[in-house]
Amino acid sequence: ISQSTGHTLQTEALAPGSEAPKGAITLGLDPAIGNREGYVLTVKADRVTLNGQTENGVFYGIQTLRKSIPAETKATSILLPAGSIQDEPRFSYRGMHLDVGRHFFPIEFVKKYIDLLALHNMNTFHWHLTEDQGWRIEIKKYPKLTEIGAWRDRTVIGRNTEEYDNTRYGGFYTQEQAKEIVKYAEERYITVIPEVDLPGHMLAALAAYPEMGCTGGPYEVCPRWGVFEDVLCIGNEKSMQFLEDVMAEIIDIFPSKYIHIGGDEAPRTRWKKCPKCQARIRTEKLKADKNHTAEDR
């Protein structure tokens, strides 16, 4: 509210059963509200009352109150229409996705993005951290992921025009910065779900550690867009260990219930010709069909 009005509101706790002074905005918890993220916002001539079943609900009600105030009003007094809003989410999962793999965004932009999610009562931030075009999260056991994988030498101009800007581009987040984002989101009742896309979309990782690909490379951090045949070698024990190690560090950074692992656009071209992959397929009796993935259909 202070962002919209320029006024910093004083806050104080009310004793149970006491009445707030006239002109106050009163926040409270009401277990009778049916949805844990629901709230009731009531505007009367002399006061505003906002109750939620949980702190989450109160927070979402505050966002509605914020949006009732004219943007950047900086007014000394604000008129709100009298009435009551009883609101609750239709969907328990409400999120948006940010791809920082293809295009890197600095941490301050990520925070602003989270602020906008909060303003619109979103509760999940899907953070797409790895791509063919860049690896964006520090993994301490594999430093080349950010030393090499976070940077591409050039970027295609437009939609795969075969013209390039010949400008080095990239960036990454340290683990401390990622934890800072998790905390920032948590303070706004938003869960961060990280995505490490695999086994496809891994050219940035293969550029850093070419031994994890079926051909052994050389690979480059991809400067263009599309779906590419070089994916993680599933028959290589180093690849399996890599995945375990990376996920162990990701889990330590992100306390979310879910970790997204992509799974899209992974051509099996290399696997079909790779002796190691074919050996694993036979040993573990792995099977698929032509309708196994959208890319095969």
Regions found by a protein language model. Give the residues of each.
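Conserved, mostly hydrophobic/aromatic
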Residues: I1, T54, M96, L117, ...
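Aromatic- and acidic-residue-enriched carbohydrate-binding clefts of CAZyme catalytic domains
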Residues: Q133-E187, M202-Q241, R270-D296
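Active-site groove signature of glycoside hydrolases
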Residues: L198, G217, F228, L243-R270
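Hydrophobic faces of well-ordered beta-strands that scaffold small-molecule active sites
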Residues: R94-L98, F125-W127, A185, V192-V196, ...
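Active-site mouth loops of central-metabolism enzymes
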Residues: G95-F109, D230-K238
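Contiguous, structured surface segment used for ligand recognition
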Residues: I1-Y93
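A conserved hydrophobic secondary-structure block that centers on an alpha-helix together
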Residues: D99-D132
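Active-site beta-loop-alpha junctions enriched in small/polar residues
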Residues: G101, T130-G134, D197-H201, D264-R268
